[in-house]
Each structure stands twice: as structure tokens, then as C-alpha cells.
Amino acid sequence: MTNVNAEIGRMVLAGGIETNLHDVGAGNPVVLVHGSGPGVTAWANWRTVMPELSRHRRVIAPDMVGFGFTQRPHGIHYGVESWVAHLAGILDALELDRVDLVGNSFGGALSLAFAIRFPHRVRRLVLMGAVGVSFELTDGLDAVWGYEPSVPNMRKVMDYFAYDRSLVSDELAELRYKASTRPGFQEAFASMFPAPRQRWVDALASSDQDIRDIRHETLILHGRDDRVIPLETSLRLNQLIEPSQLHVFGRCGHWVQIEQNRGFIRLVNDFLAAED
């Protein structure tokens, strides 16, 4: 009997990088850009929302370079420019001129940077618990980026993610720990955000003026009780992006798409269904 790993979709060559992505549904394309948790994959990030979102549109969820089952090129320098270039390469490989972007946390910073650099290739933006502006490094984000593989450390990271700690079972912590120790995963992850880590928050941030210049309709989502990316970042983005709306979920941490699954799907579906 074949053991099929649901985290592996199909491979495309994007900007010279063998890229694992999930491509489901039909219609207007939306690209889901995952966060930067240890052992993360697009599937792990978006599995709870892809079935519903893909009922009405084409949903593409790639593993960004350095993460998941996408190739890790020898000698690559991980940073905003390389990740944005990879995202552009994914769109080119799929022959997509213009897409909606949904970015989670680190993926929000990449989506924002992509919209600034390639405004003609983005229709609408959704930013969820996004980085994108500078803030003082939180204990939660320091724990995420400073993760060293062990089950207790993975549980600590996941406790920071969740408002409802009952979601963080021993089984889930063990599962994600195993994911973080797959060949090549931790080596690439450890090279991305070495201490001191405030500099990586600042490096992922776009300038206030560049953000002010964004003209895309933007939906900003955040958990009120987020201990990884502070709510103030989304308040700031809402102030800077003139055509934006902000929704704050109470009793919710950094896992908006999991802890407020139905609300996330409803808001994103309604927002992306609107005509410009």
C-alpha cells in the first residue's frame, strides 16, 4: 500500500526552482502564502480552508523556497527579494498575469512586498497576522524563529500560536516536530533568522511610503490575542493602506484560519467575490 503524503501536491519549475504547490478549483486565481513556523508547509498552513475557498475559485498554495518540499538551492540567500522573485516565478510558471494574494504572518510580508514591486500582478490583498511593518520582536516570534528541534520546544512554539491551548495536543506537537526534522528542513530554517532576530523583523518590513502607495483593496485580519505578531501591526497597516478594512477576532491567537475558521472563510470569500 502506497503511503501518500498530503503535503506534496505537484512540482513546477518556478524561476529555476523545483516548487511544490497545491492547485485546486477553477476560476479567478488566488495564491495563499504560508507563514514561517518550523516545519511549515503550504498544506499544513492552509488545509482547513482550501476546500471551501476552492469551491468558488482556483486556489494555489506553494511551498516557498526554503520551506516544505520545494527545492533548497545551494548557496541561496534567503530574504525578501529572493522570496518575492520566487513568487513571481510561480505566477510565470502557471502563466498567471494577475492574482489575489492571501498572506499569513511572514507570508503577509511577502504578499505586501510583492504588491509593492508588481502592483499590476495583484488584484486584491488579504493580510492575516501579517508582518510588513516593523515592531519590537515578541517573545513568541523569537521562540518561533529560534526553534531548535525537540517535542517540548515544538509544543512551546504552538502554545504561542494558539489562544485555545487545548488545540495543542501531544499528538499534534509530535507530528509537527517530526515535520520539522525532515531532511533539510531545519538546516534551511535555522539559516533564515539567526539571532539577533530584531533585524529580520525590520528586513521583512516595507517602508511606510511604499505601503501608503498601495492602491489594492485590502482585507486585514488579526487575532486580538496574538502573542507572535502584535495586533498593533495590523492597526498600523490599516492606517497606512487607504483602501483597507480591518477585522479583529476576539478569543483568537496567531491561528486565525484555524481558531476562527468559519469567520476567516466567510470574510475572505466575500471579499474576493467582490468586483473592483
UniProtKB/Swiss-Prot annotation:
Active site: S105, D226, H254
Keyword Hydrolase annotated: yes
Reaction(s) catalysed (UniProt annotation): (2Z,4E)-2-hydroxy-6-oxohepta-2,4-dienoate + H2O = (2Z)-2-hydroxypenta-2,4-dienoate + acetate + H(+)
Functional pathway: Xenobiotic degradation; toluene degradation
GO CC term, one of those recorded: membrane
Residue span, AB hydrolase-1 domain: 28-259
Family matches, as Pfam families: Abhydrolase_1
EC class: hydrolase
EC number assigned by the record: 3.7.1.25
GO biological process: toluene catabolic process
UniProt KW keywords: Aromatic hydrocarbons catabolism, Hydrolase, Serine esterase
Keyword Phosphoprotein in record: no
Gene Ontology MF annotations: 2-hydroxy-6-oxohepta-2,4-dienoate hydrolase activity; carboxylic ester hydrolase activity
InterPro entries cross-referenced by the UniProt entry: AB_hydrolase_1 (IPR000073), AB_hydrolase_fold (IPR029058), AB_hydrolase_sf (IPR050266), Epox_hydrolase-like (IPR000639)
Family: Belongs to the DmpD/TodF/XylF esterase family.
Its biological purpose: Catalyzes the hydrolysis of 2-hydroxy-6-oxohepta-2,4-dienoate into 2-hydroxypenta-2,4-dienoate and acetate.
Protein name as annotated: 2-hydroxy-6-oxo-2,4-heptadienoate hydrolase
Organism field: Pseudomonas putida (strain ATCC 700007 / DSM 6899 / JCM 31910 / BCRC 17059 / LMG 24140 / F1)
